[in-house]
Swiss-Prot record:
This is Glycerol-3-phosphate acyltransferase. It is found in: Cell inner membrane. It comes from Vibrio vulnificus (strain YJ016). The gene is plsY. PANTHER family: GLYCEROL-3-PHOSPHATE ACYLTRANSFERASE-RELATED (PTHR30309:SF0), INNER MEMBRANE PROTEIN YGIH (PTHR30309). Probably interacts with PlsX. Catalyzes the transfer of an acyl group from acyl-phosphate (acyl-PO(4)) to glycerol-3-phosphate (G3P) to form lysophosphatidic acid (LPA). This enzyme utilizes acyl-phosphate as fatty acyl donor, but not acyl-CoA or acyl-ACP.
Amino acid sequence: MDAMAVTMTIIAYLLGSISSAVLICRVLRLPDPRGVGSNNPGATNVLRIGGKGAAAAVLLCDMLKGTIPVWSAYYLGIEPVLLGVIAIAACLGHMYPLFFHFQGGKGVATALGAIAPIGLDLTGMIMATWLLVAILFRYSSLAALVTVLLAPMYTWMIKPQYTLPVGMLCCLIVLRHHQNIRRLFTGEEPKIGEKKLQMPKSQ
């Protein structure tokens, strides 16, 4: 890995470490998403506690955390496998943010943002899959899992040279969802839009 790739990997992690959900909730004077609802600082939990506008803002910012470093690295001519490493770094920053006590989200939106520079056709297929599963079953985590399992196949169909880095990224997302997988099997996973909240954790 050359110096440019190393630099972009570090930048990707630091950018990913900016928790959009926590910052937007602070600005809007909403509860800390790490202490209410699903305790996950992501768009789905912010939807529960703050509504569609706040959730949309979080979704956009989280996607940009993946898009900006990967697109920049692509523009600089960094090879596909290393683009995957940079994408993973952005997602790791989101999952384990340096600036927020390593309490982060699941990385789905950031991963989507990281994949987006490959092409709008691939991005559209991924978003359509997530929306279809989410509408049918109303589980954000299930939609994410189905989508990331299919994403490498979609990539192989459209731009096969990026299949390995996308596959690496998708494996990380599946591992991060291990608790959601358990709750799906036990019937304890909250559905999209549920308003039932836990009391905020004491500081």
